[in-house]
Amino acid sequence: MNNCATFSMPHSNATNHTTLSHPVCNNNANCFTRSELYAIWSETINTLKRTFKIKNVHAHMLEDDSGEIKDYIRANLSRFTVITGKCSKRKVCHHDKRIARTLHLEKNLVDEYACSVTHVYSAPKW
C-alpha cells in the first residue's frame, strides 16, 4: 500500500487539479498534520503563480505579508482533499479550526523552529 498523500488543489478551471505526493505518517487518517498544511500552502503558491496572482507568494506562513495566501486557502478550503493510503479522499474543510489556528500563530520562524526542535529533542540542538 502506498504511504503517500496527494493534495488536490482547485484551479480557475474546476476540472483541472494539481497533485503533490510526499510520504506522511498515516496512523490516523482523521488527523490533519501541519506538514499537510505546509503542502497545501506550497500548492496554493504554485496555483497563484500559474494564475499570475504573485503578490507576496514568497511569504512564509508565519510572516505578516502572507495574507493573500491565507485568504486563498480560507476561500477554497471546501474544495481541498487529502488522499492517503488509509483514506481515499479526506476533506480538508473538516479541519477548519485547526487550520485557522495554525494560520494565526503568533510566532516567527526562529520561535517556530525552536518549538519544533524542542518538541523532538527536549532541548534545542542547533
Curated annotation (Swiss-Prot):
Keywords, comma-separated and alphabetical: Transcription, Transcription regulation
Keyword Transcription: yes
Record-level GO BP terms: regulation of DNA-templated transcription; viral life cycle
Stored InterPro entries: Baculo_LEF-11
Taxonomy, superkingdom: Viruses
Keyword match Transcription regulation: yes
Stored Pfam families: Baculo_LEF-11
Family per record: Belongs to the baculoviridae LEF-11 family.
Protein role: Involved in late/very late gene activation.
Protein name (record): Late expression factor 11
Source species of the chain: Epiphyas postvittana nucleopolyhedrovirus (EppoMNPV)
Origin organism lineage: Viruses, Viruses incertae sedis, Naldaviricetes, Lefavirales, Baculoviridae
Encoding gene, per UniProt annotation: LEF-11
